[in-house]
Structure formats: structure tokens, C-alpha cells
């Protein structure tokens, strides 16, 4: 039977999605707080940089692995301020996370141009050539078959549509690399235990980050899925990177 990584452990391919889904269900109520604490607020700056990759907000946008909706909500807020006609579909395999996003959109009065769909990134329930942009932030490393998800991204994008991915990456510099490793494997799981009462979930988080392909290797994977003009931009010394590509 086909196996894949769940953190540093090997599990059956069919079991990984259930395990990942279970983790996010258990930490859903503390998800936003944990993001702020773990990244010392940096995730907000990274996401601001990420949405700048979308200059045209008069667009159909698919946000995959939406989680609690940070990316889509920022885009909706920006479009509303500009008077743009944006259409957003928030998709996530975890219904509890998506419900959190829906509640936030209602509280912020940003729900008007949004749809919320529980879906698997490997088998998206959308027609070919449907979207101007495909966004995914801190989600693709949790997909059991990343190559399959990339091919689905290519399929649902319109010709000249843009793929944009924000993901943890590989730190290059020596001192920062050593500190980041210590912080990831020691501090983050401890914060997870104190705040979310779930050390194991955040051990999985840091292990999944450690196993995710390097910037250049992920670039090769994106290109192999059919995309052109594949580029990446490191943020915070390579702690995260923004990957972008076009369907041509």
C-alpha cells in the first residue's frame, strides 16, 4: 500500500488526510491565536506580502486550504474598499475551520461575495478553466499528494491564470537556521501544549515544515505540473517563501 509522511512518521496514503483533518479539528478554536504566538505576529506581514501578488481584484479567486479565512478576508476587505467586483470561493477539507472563516466573514460584513465549500485539494469540485487566481497559504504541505494538488490547481485555473502559494521553506543563513531549528522543535510544541493543550499537533507542524521541499525543489514540482514563469520570493530569510506561476 502506498505510504506517505505524516510528520516524521510513515502512514498509509489514505490515512494521512484523516490524521491531518483530525489535528485541525482539535486546534480549530485556538488556530488564530496560535498563529500569532508562534510567528510573533510575522504571519500577518507574510500574508500582506502574499495578497500583493493579486493586483486585479475584479477576479474569480479560489482560496484552497482556507483555514480560518485570513487570505480571503483580506482580499475581500481590500476589494470592498476599492469597489472591485471580486468573487471568492473558500475551500478547505476541514469543515470546522471553514465554519470559523464563515463566522469571521459575517462578523466583518465581508461575506457577500464569498462561497464556502468543503473540498479536497486533490479532487476539486470545479470545472476546468474556472478561476483567475488560485491561492493557498500554509496548506499545501499538509496535502498527501502534493503533485496531484498542483495538477488540480493547473486544471481549474483559466489560461493566464495565476497560482500563488505561501509556504514554510528552508532557511539558508547559519545563525538564523540554528535558532529557527531550536525555536521550531522546542518552543513551538511547548506553546501548543500551553495554549491549545495539544503538543502533538504542533510537533506534526514543525516536522511537516522540516520535510517540505526546498524552494528550488518545489519550483521544479510546480513546473512539472504544467505551469510556466515559475518564481519564488523568500521572506524573513527563507522561513517562508511565496511561489508564483502562470497557466499559459
From Swiss-Prot:
Record field: catalytic activity: a 2-demethylmenaquinol + S-adenosyl-L-methionine = a menaquinol + S-adenosyl-L-homocysteine + H(+); a 2-methoxy-6-(all-trans-polyprenyl)benzene-1,4-diol + S-adenosyl-L-methionine = a 5-methoxy-2-methyl-3-(all-trans-polyprenyl)benzene-1,4-diol + S-adenosyl-L-homocysteine + H(+)
Broad EC category: transferase
Keyword field: Menaquinone biosynthesis, Methyltransferase, S-adenosyl-L-methionine, Transferase, Ubiquinone biosynthesis
Function: Methyltransferase required for the conversion of demethylmenaquinol (DMKH2) to menaquinol (MKH2) and the conversion of 2-polyprenyl-6-methoxy-1,4-benzoquinol (DDMQH2) to 2-polyprenyl-3-methyl-6-methoxy-1,4-benzoquinol (DMQH2).
Recorded family membership: Belongs to the class I-like SAM-binding methyltransferase superfamily. MenG/UbiE family.
InterPro entries, alphabetized: SAM-dependent_MTases_sf, UbiE/COQ5_MeTrFase, UbiE/COQ5_MeTrFase_CS
Underlying gene: ubiE
E.C. code: 2.1.1.163, 2.1.1.201
PROSITE patterns in UniProt: SAM_MT_UBIE (PS51608), UBIE_1 (PS01183), UBIE_2 (PS01184)
SUPFAM superfamilies from the UniProt entry: S-adenosyl-L-methionine-dependent methyltransferases
UniProt-listed Gene3D superfamilies: Vaccinia Virus protein VP39
Pathway: Quinol/quinone metabolism; menaquinone biosynthesis; menaquinol from 1,4-dihydroxy-2-naphthoate: step 2/2; Cofactor biosynthesis; ubiquinone biosynthesis
Keyword Transferase carried by entry: yes
Molecular-function annotations in GO: 2-methoxy-6-polyprenyl-1,4-benzoquinol methyltransferase activity; demethylmenaquinone methyltransferase activity
This protein's record includes keyword Cytoplasm: no
Gene Ontology BP term (one): aerobic respiration
Superkingdom of the organism of origin: Bacteria
Residues binding S-adenosyl-L-methionine: 68, 92, 120-121
Name of the protein in its database record: Ubiquinone/menaquinone biosynthesis C-methyltransferase UbiE
Amino acid at each position: 500500500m502506498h505510504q506517505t509522511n505524516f510528520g516524521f512518521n510513515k502512514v498509509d496514503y489514505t490515512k494521512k488526510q484523516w490524521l491531518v483533518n483530525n489535528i485541525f479539528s482539535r486546534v480549530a478554536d485556538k488556530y488564530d491565536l496560535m498563529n500569532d504566538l508562534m510567528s510573533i505576529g510575522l504571519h500577518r506581514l507574510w500574508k500582506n506580502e502574499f495578497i500583493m501578488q493579486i493586483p486585479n481584484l475584479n477576479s474569480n479567486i479560489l482560496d484552497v486550504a482556507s483555514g480560518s479565512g485570513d487570505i480571503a478576508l483580506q482580499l475581500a476587505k481590500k476589494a470592498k474598499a476599492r469597489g472591485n467586483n471580486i468573487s471568492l470561493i473558500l475551500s478547505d477539507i476541514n469543515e470546522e475551520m471553514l465554519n470559523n472563516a464563515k463566522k469571521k466573514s459575517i462578523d466583518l460584513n465581508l461575506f457577500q461575495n464569498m462561497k464556502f465549500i468543503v473540498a479536497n485539494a486533490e479532487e476539486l469540485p470545479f470545472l476546468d478553466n474556472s478561476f483567475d487566481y488560485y491561492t493557498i497559504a500554509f496548506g499545501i504541505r499538509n496535502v498527501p499528494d502534493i503533485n496531484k494538488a498542483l495538477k488540480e490547481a493547473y486544471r481549474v485555473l483559466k489560461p493566464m491564470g495565476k497560482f500563488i502559494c505561501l509556504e514554510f521553506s528552508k532557511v539558508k543563513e547559519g545563525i538564523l537556521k540554528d535558532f529557527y531549528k531550536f525555536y521550531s522543535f522546542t518552543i513551538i510544541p511547548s506553546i501548543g501544549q500551553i495554549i491549545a493543550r495539544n503538543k502533538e499537533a504542533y510537533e506534526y507542524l514543525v516536522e511537516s515544515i522540516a520535510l517540505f521541499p526546498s524552494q528550488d525543489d518545489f519550483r521544479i514540482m510546480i513546473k512539472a505540473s504544467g505551469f510556466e514563469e515559475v518564481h519564488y520570493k523568500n521572506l524573513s530569510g527563507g522561513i517562508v517563501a511565496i511561489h508564483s506561476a502562470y497557466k499559459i
